[in-house]
A protein has these predicted regions:
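Extended hydrophobic/Leu-rich segments
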Residues: 1-27, 37-48
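Predominantly extracellular/luminal regions of secreted and cell-surface proteins
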Residues: 27-65
Length: 174
């Protein structure tokens, strides 16, 4: 379905909203709080590093491309991670993770951490921890915190610890 909208104005130079500000996602937190609309800050962030990529069809940038049909896959030794730079400090309050449950429930990320820091010289600090996860799509909220850099750190990539493949279809940070 494609929707188009137009507005007629009498102004010579009407205000324009960048397309990037129009990308928003409606969320309902796992704790049942009311749905809110958030902007995915990773859409504007620079991907600066990852632990690995399985092949050219499963690269790290696919974890934040907004397409749940593409994914980042890393079969290197755990922990697996993907790092982003917002370019400046941002206040974040939550995140969304879409796992590979569509490939089988065994591929749902079991344990991971959202981490942050404000300088490349600082140690990563855990902002939120997801453990013993069984959900394919997870939405989490936490106390607002300001960071410049954010990392998804996957320590147990699957439900069966003998399988070693981090498979992330989408990662969003708000």
């Amino acid at each position: 379905i494609v929707l188009f909208a137009a507005t007629l104005v009498n102004e010579k130079y009407p205000a324009v909203t960048p397309a990037s500000e129009l990308f928003r996602t409606a969320l309902k937190a796992d704790n049942g709080e009311e749905a809110t609309t958030k902007t995915n800050l990773l859409k504007q962030a620079k991907l600066i590093k990852c632990s690995g990529e399985t092949n050219e069809k499963e690269v790290a940038r696919y974890a934040v491309d907004g397409d749940v049909k593409t994914k980042w896959c890393d079969t290197s030794t755990a922990p697996n991670y993907i790092d982003f730079d917002f370019g400046k400090e941002q206040t974040i309050r939550g995140w969304k993770l879409v796992n590979a449950g569509n490939e089988g429930s065994v591929f749902i990320t079991h344990t991971c951490f959202l981490q942050g820091r404000n300088s490349p010289d600082e140690e990563w600090k855990t902002i939120d921890e997801l453990s013993d996860n069984k959900k394919n799509t997870v939405v989490r909220q936490f106390k607002p915190t300001s960071v410049r850099y954010v990392r998804l750190l996957v320590t147990q990539s699957t439900q069966n610890n003998s399988l070693k493949a981090a498979r992330i279809y989408e990662l969003e940070v708000y």
